[in-house]
């Protein structure tokens, strides 16, 4: 190819390339929104700064259950005391019946009585089982509760040293399997029904004895708890 022809060919290629580049730029300008360059740069930088979406916190359930109780049931949670500073607690339908904040928990056996048909609290009381003669009064208190009552019992500190046969028999009559196995500072929780039967699948009782080789606290076993949902309308 002659030098003149070669030069003309290169010039044509250059002009064609320039036209293609110009047209591509024109199309790109038409497609991109009219946004200031500073905003574009800010948006690019902020991509890495945007917060990561998090799952919403789970909704709090009655008595701090992990999952809600079905309709037409009562939610309950019993927690024994643990050590000197972790107080026993009885929660029913998201109301703390006995606990540190309510100021009605003490050493011994703590009892809350609820009217099963209305869900209203009838009485709360504690009985010191380390000092004093409180076993007889506790037995009478339990025996005097009306029919169609729910009884919730939890220990704080020691619930056995002054516990006598009459009180043990009264609690055993409500269905307890562990009351006669209580030892010094045993952690114990118990739910009972008077005048009707609870479903067999409901967890009613748990006990944890003091054992120096495995106690969580110095001289005390770990606290224990049970929770559940009691159906309404039982006979």
Curated annotation (Swiss-Prot):
Record's comment on post-translational modification: O-glycosylated.
Keywords: Apoptosis, Cytokine, Disulfide bond, Glycoprotein, Lectin, Secreted, Signal
A Pfam family per the record: ILEI
Main localisation: secreted
Domain GG-type lectin: 72-233
Record-stated family: Belongs to the FAM3 family.
Name this protein carries in UniProt: Protein FAM3B
Organism: Mus musculus
């Amino acid at each position: 190819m002659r030098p003149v022809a070669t030069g003309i060919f290169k010039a044509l290629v250059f002009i064609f390339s320039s036209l293609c580049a110009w047209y591509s730029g024109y199309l790109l300008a038409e497609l991109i929104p009219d946004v200031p360059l500073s905003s574009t740069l800010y948006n690019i930088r902020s991509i890495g700064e945007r917060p990561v979406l998090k799952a919403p916190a789970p909704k709090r359930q009655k008595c701090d259950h992990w999952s809600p109780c079905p309709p037409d049931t009562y939610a309950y949670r019993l927690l024994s005391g643990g050590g000197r500073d972790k107080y026993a607690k009885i929660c029913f339908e998201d109301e703390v019946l006995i606990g540190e904040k309510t100021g009605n928990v003490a050493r011994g056996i703590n009892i809350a009585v609820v009217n099963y048909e209305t869900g209203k609290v009838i009485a709360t009381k504690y009985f010191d089982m380390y000092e004093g003669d409180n076993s007889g009064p506790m037995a009478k208190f339990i025996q005097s509760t009306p029919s169609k009552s729910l009884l919730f019992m939890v220990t704080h500190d020691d619930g056995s040293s002054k516990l006598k046969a009459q009180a043990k028999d009264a609690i055993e009559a409500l269905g307890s399997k562990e009351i006669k196995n209580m030892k010094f500072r045993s952690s114990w929780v118990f739910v009972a029904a008077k005048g009707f039967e609870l479903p067999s699948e409901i967890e009613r009782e748990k006990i944890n004895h003091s054992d120096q080789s495995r106690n969580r606290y110095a001289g005390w076993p770990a606290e224990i708890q049970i929770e559940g949902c009691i159906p309404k309308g039982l006979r």
